[in-house]
A protein has these predicted regions:
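Thioredoxin-like thiol-disulfide oxidoreductase module
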Residues: 60-127
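Local sequence-structure signature of Cys/Sec-based thiol-disulfide redox active-site neighborhoods
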Residues: 23-64
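Detector for methionine-enriched segments
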Residues: 1, 46-47, 78, 122
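Arg/Lys-rich, intrinsically disordered low-complexity tails that mediate electrostatic binding
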Residues: 1-27
């Protein structure tokens, strides 16, 4: 009699003689980190090096997507984010108190960054 495996479980895992078989992870993005900025904004320019470092440090993680919305394309950019990542949510992305506005969307939940726009603080906030 042949033994069958239950592949319906999301976390299906089977160990046999030092081999592990695991379902492939989905390509769905769990975390979106973004900023709305203006080229002429002094605060945006001051934050740019830390933002680039954040992207470099966290960009290696496959489940994180970075979004940058420039002031010239603000309405279109926010519409794309709202449609793609917040489609089922009542809350929609908007500019919060000026430039830069830094935000994250984790599993459809939107939150804004209100701390110091330095690498260490932004990194802590990303994983809260």
């Amino acid at each position: 009699m042949r033994k069958t495996n239950n592949y319906k479980s999301k976390n299906y895992k089977r160990n046999t003689k030092n081999r592990t078989y695991k379902k492939k992870p989905s390509k769905h993005v769990n975390l979106v980190i973004g900023k709305i900025y203006a080229d002429w904004c002094g605060y945006c320019q001051m934050m740019q090096n830390d933002w680039d470092s954040l992207k470099r440090d966290l960009g290696k993680k496959k489940k994180i997507e970075f979004v940058e919305i420039e002031q010239k394309n603000e309405a279109d950019g926010m519409n794309v984010v709202n449609t793609k990542h917040l489609n089922k949510s009542q809350v929609k992305l908007s500019l919060q108190g000026g430039y830069p506005t830094v935000f994250k969307i984790r599993n459809g939940n939107l939150s804004y960054f209100n701390g110091n726009r330095v690498l260490e603080d932004m990194k802590k906030w990303v994983f809260e």
